[in-house]
Amino acid sequence: MDGGSAEALRALAAVAGALVVAVTMVVTARLAGRIPATIAGLAMATVGAAPFIESFTLSGELLASVFAVASLLAFVFYLERPAPGWLIAAGLLTGCAVLVKQSAFDAGAAAAVYLVWTRRRGGVAPAAALVAAAFVPVVIAAATAQSFHDWWYAMVTYRDQADSILTGSFHTRLHQARLSLPAAERGLGALALLALAGWRRWPLLGVLWLGFATLAVIGGGNFHNHYYQQMVPPLALLAGIGGAELLRRRKVAWAAVVAIALAATVFVTAPLWFDSPNAQARTIFPDDPHLQTDAQVVRYVRAHTRPGQHIFVMWAAADLYYLSGRDPSFRYMWFRNIQAIPGALGQARRMLAGKRPPALVVGINSPASMDPSGRTQRILDTRFRKVATVAGVPIYAPR
């Protein structure tokens, strides 16, 4: 392997983003008309694509949204013409969305609740059929997994034990939420204000969709900025309705508020267009300084390892594996995984001290940042030697 292409990832993100915008426009047109759909698409493709919530990245939220929004469109078709096929399609697409990102149940949950809410007992059977269809791809994935235990842990147990709003201290989760609010305000504020302009005309299905998307963001617990991407499609739908209402009723005062919010969004975003890539990375990813040195580190790794050899990036920066074309020597590639999964740190130590150590250890983070006991540092001191420092990043090779 010669390494992955960042340009390929960007192109795929652009295609996925365009698909989500297009399908959201169709959903909006079916629920509210062409003018709201046009406004929803424009809003989603501009302010909804805010860099502050990392909307330009090929995130799990973006990829899952392709399936989630498509599932809602299938459900809208079912409401227009109650053919069971559309209901089953909505369920299957919901299941696919959840397989991409466990939090991407929002559209499917909104559809199921909508059926019961509006049809009472008559909605129970179709809602059950939708939910049953959603489980089909999930069951297939579980049945075909190499290890059902590992699959179950990755899909269910990990979140339940280590990483959700229900784990950790309430104070810590509240602090993380507060830290994410500035990015959420800059990324979603204008959309939310535009949506509020037409709140009296919001369709129940759109309200439920936004509600479940918000619940999914909160449920993740860590409040990473990219979590908020999940709220963009339902907010865009409601923003399209709000924008159409402003045009219809000529609400000058509210239009002025929205205009100020849009201007503020442009004001804080436009400078990034003219910044260098490193400056952009510092602004958008302040907690990931390795992004500014990854290119140099990747060149070194490629030059000093062969395809087929394994490396270990300590403790995070999984992009280095992809960009260098070298496989990881350890199964967990994110800081939080090793920090939160019981026994993961011990497994990492055993891997480093084992008979087949990685060809290189890239010290993106210090050993003590994960292991203050000093045991990982002692393994590096006795089993490895520092062979280079690339852009401030120490690199070790086995002795």
Identify the residue ranges that each predicted region occupies:
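Transmembrane-helix motifs of polytopic, lipid-linked glycan transferases
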Residues: 11-35, 39, 46, 70
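Specific aromatic-rich, kink-prone transmembrane helix
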Residues: 23, 64-81, 86, 93-94, ...
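Membrane-interface transmembrane helices that cradle and orient dolichyl/undecaprenyl
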Residues: 71-88, 116, 187-202
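Membrane-interface alpha helices of multi-pass inner-membrane proteins
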Residues: 86-102, 108-115, 132-138, 210-219
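Short periplasmic/luminal acceptor-recognition loop of GT-C membrane glycosyltransferases, typified by
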Residues: 105-109, 287-340, 346-370
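Perimembrane helix-loop-helix junctions
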Residues: 107-133, 193-200, 237, 243-249
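Hydrophobic, aromatic-rich transmembrane alpha-helices
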Residues: 181-212, 239
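Hydrophobic/aromatic-rich transmembrane helices and adjacent perimembrane loops
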Residues: 221-254
